[in-house]
Amino acid sequence: MELEVFAGQEKSELSMIEVARAILEERGRDKEMYFSDLVNAIQVYLEKSDADIREALPFFYSDLNTDGSFIPLGENKWGLRSWYGIDEIDEEIVTLEEDEDGAPKHKRKRVNAFMDGDEDAIDYSDDDPEDESFNTAEEDTEYDEEDPDDEKSEVESYDSEINEIIPDEDLDENVDLDEEDDDYSDDEEDEEGE
């Protein structure tokens, strides 16, 4: 493969991006190339080894994306931006996508949960099983009067728990409580609280 643009130049001095531009210009419009085919054509022209191409590939791909003269056309196809007018660029990309897909894409149907009479609408009113008990007719709840026997059993259970901690034998039944403590008065309490 010979490129007229580079006639008389050393191939070792050429960059991959220059060669890519020349290859695409020679092919002409509507002859976009897949990235892999473009890299293979560059490798053949520059007579570089696979190892050299693999090493330069990330830099070449970055240059291809940042150089303003190339345009990605979808599915890793590349062309020259000069082939397309500004208004034509979006149309060309859309056309390629439609041609490749074959069938137009279907839009998903949006569901409005508040629509009445729509069979597909989601009814959120019956989602929570806890709400089922509230949907039934409210029954009058009758509260029993306090049963004195219940109170006695509660007191006995508290007493038994206290006895487990402090047995009855250890309790001093003759504790005298002096309601008036000579060492402490209400006036001192007020002063400390302030």
Swiss-Prot record:
Q: Name one Pfam family in it.
A: HARE-HTH
Arranged from A to Z, the UniProt key words for this protein are:
DNA-directed RNA polymerase, Nucleotidyltransferase, Transcription, Transferase
**Where is the segment annotated Disordered?**
117-194
**HTH HARE-type domain spans which residues?**
14-83
GO BP term (any one): regulation of DNA-templated transcription
- The highest taxon in the source lineage is Bacteria
| GO CC entries | DNA-directed RNA polymerase complex
Q: Which GO terms describe its molecular function?
A: DNA-directed RNA polymerase activity
To which protein family does this belong? Belongs to the RpoE family.
Q: How does it assemble?
A: RNAP is composed of a core of 2 alpha, a beta and a beta' subunits. The core is associated with a delta subunit and one of several sigma factors.
Tell me the NCBIfam families matching this sequence. Answer: RNAP_delt_lowGC (TIGR04567)
What is its biological role? Participates in both the initiation and recycling phases of transcription. In the presence of the delta subunit, RNAP displays an increased specificity of transcription, a decreased affinity for nucleic acids, and an increased efficiency of RNA synthesis because of enhanced recycling.
Q: What is the protein name for this chain? A: Probable DNA-directed RNA polymerase subunit delta
Name its species.
Streptococcus mutans serotype c (strain ATCC 700610 / UA159)
Provide the gene name from the record.
rpoE
